[in-house]
């Protein structure tokens, strides 16, 4: 397996809704999920080349990739009440949407985020790493400051773990737990291609980020002090 380290800088806020949470109460995972990272690389390949076949090639190169993240020492999370437009159940020609309210969480990284990607076919996707423009929601903009090949990621880097490892890990130490999604090793490109007409079922599998951190809280904010 070959490893690449990406140094990511988020000039603004990051937001990525916890899987299966309501869009009206959209709490955020404090780090991008493995599926978000992999699908962003696929989308970047298609966007920059205009070639869906190239996106498919990158998909199979990164589908089974090992993803690790080393966050900054602190992560700030703000909770915001926003106005939103929701599609009406019985829309009319003049009124398609209705005004509602929702809660959003936005994550602020005071320093860079280090992302580690390990896979066998890293050379297929490596040229697209530096072209990443967002992770998570489309307004979670970023730019890649540095790309370098490494032997292996540091042990302190966070990895999304499956159910079996999760049960064992939390029995030993206390963690802050965030559910995330990864792409199944059985997933096909047609299932994530919105124009293929194929079923998107069983594309993702649930995993968990276990984060060692102290939490400071206010009424509409919290601060995670990461402990590696």
From Swiss-Prot:
Keyword Metal-binding: no
Keyword Nucleus in annotation: no
Family matches, as InterPro entries: CRISPR-assoc_prot_Cas5_N
Domain of life: Archaea
Keywords: Antiviral defense
GO biological process, one term: defense response to virus
Similarity comment text for this entry: Belongs to the CRISPR-associated protein Cas5 family.
Reported function: CRISPR (clustered regularly interspaced short palindromic repeat) is an adaptive immune system that provides protection against mobile genetic elements (viruses, transposable elements and conjugative plasmids). CRISPR clusters contain spacers, sequences complementary to antecedent mobile elements, and target invading nucleic acids. CRISPR clusters are transcribed and processed into CRISPR RNA (crRNA).
NCBIfam families membership: CRISPR_cas5
Protein name per the record: CRISPR-associated protein Cas5
